From Swiss-Prot:
Annotated spans, Unknown insert: 452-593
Pathway: Cofactor biosynthesis; ubiquinone biosynthesis
GN (gene name): ubiD
The name this protein goes by in its record: 3-octaprenyl-4-hydroxybenzoate carboxy-lyase
Enzyme Commission identifier(s): 4.1.1.-
Amino acid sequence: MKFKDLRDFIDYLEQEGQLKRIKQPIDPNQEITEICDRTLRAGGPALLFENPIGYDIPILANLFGTPERVAMGMGRQDVKELREVGKLLAYLKEPEPPRGFRDAMDKLPVFKQVFNMPTKRLRKAPCQQVIWQGDDVDLDKIPVMSCWPDDVAPLLTWGLTITKGPNKPRQNLGIYRQQKIAKNKVIMRWLAHRGGALDLRDWMDTHPGEPFPISVAFGADPATILGAVTPVPDTLSEYAFAGLLRGSKTEVVKSLSNDLDIPASAEIVLEGYIDPNEFADEGPYGDHTGYYNEVERHHVFTITHVTMREDPIYHSTYTGRPPDEPAVLGVALNEVFVPILQKQFPEIVDFYLPPEGCSYRMAVVTMKKQYPGHAKRVMMGVWSFLRQFMYTKFVIVLDDDVNARDWNSVIQAMTTRMDPVRDTLLIESTPIDSLDFASPVVGLGSKMGLDATVKWEAETASTPSGTSQAAPDFDIETGTRNLLMQFPEIVDFYLPQEADKNSMAIVSIKKDAAGHATRVMDGVWSFLSQFTDAKFVIVCDDDVNVRDWNDVIWAITTRMDPSRDTLLIANAPIDSLDLTSPVVGLGSKMGLDATNKWQGETAREWGRPITKDPEIVAKVDAIWNELGILD
């Protein structure tokens, strides 16, 4: 499937029943977010809002709201085919010459695609049919969405930001959110390791004090959009990769105010510059973590020109607690990552970024273990091989007989193959996403690796004694009632069936003080010691459903700094038949404090969870059936 532009893709999706036109007037202030959130959670279609209230420009949203539509945008029929995209990227990252005639013939399709990598520059392009410049530049005429009740201002979300470093031969395309602060100004929020930020830093070194040129394109063709979110090698332009995906050269045109190439088929383009000395406070915004982020200082992007198609379409999205559109993109791009990792680490069988872990904060890896300590090498490889994973806080490594995408399978392996102290790797003072308020310092926190593989002889000296005493029968309902009498702050108590011999407990509490979670852990261990040896206890707040792994993993990845919030107890009594313990009958325990932190537990301002406006919810309730989105 080849899509020349966004409209070509829209037509295709509509023919396939994958796009719904919304003709009713809908407010871009939170109403579109509410409608898209319901649609995405139901696996529904892309949405084209033809009459956003107050504007004459339609809004396209939920475009990549299912992994299948991401695959379609990459020219594939099925999500599984995205592994082929990953294999292509793995080859481009480390190309190898043919090892003979047969290998050359096998690689011929790849070699042919190389002809689609150069861009095709046009003299005229649809994206420059309409031009605003000077005083005519007015972002208020574009239907920029406000997504959540406490968002500080409207937010531009799907723009492809085009930059070029002074010492680099290629342009960089990246997607960074932009807060509207004036008719001609937005705040450019990009992380320090991202391509645009690196280009700006190089520019400031070589052109101190001079304005840094930028162009931002909205509504490019799907291959170019997805090329900007795919982990292409640093030496490869996103435009070149889009040409490979599409099977034809990416058409570009020179910006009016600078030398940057922009997608010729884009719907709307913003051109301008960053003054290296101009900053503004960005945020707070409801983010993909499910919380409002902290206010941070970022550079201001001043817009000198706006160009667009006649009758343009504005492409937008929202971010919120998973699942959201970025989480869905993460699920699809997960398939691209696997072959890239396998080329460097062929022992890896599967690699999974669970969307409930905010797409990148947790990775689950299965492998063919080949020697003692192998799991820790894989952990280090995940954290260091691709910069996309430098902010991943938790890595769980398992054998290849475990299903990395099934929490029941993962938890069973953790409870039967781990001694928590021996098999946990904690690394402090590592790079962390600045949006992660759980870290002790902005941009700096800890990482945790869990080795849930079967241990080799050199990794454990334990041998079974065969003398374990049977624990008394444990009636869960009676036990839970007794526990709640001792700890009335406990809201729910759950022993997952997939955890071996009740060796994991998950508890939700009404937290009322710093250190409360640790006290509950101690109480749960003391109570359960009458019946079973619980190696793992997880404590969450009462807004978490402890019987839903999506909720629990979300709490762990958003509310924990691994080093600060993990309690490890060595030399604890363990079932003598537990072969994972270092000493017969003596092992270790792990407690995870996945609660919101109080003053005294963190020095940072804690995130506020996103909550919807009840009036907006009620308004959408009233028109939901009329919209007919899921019919």
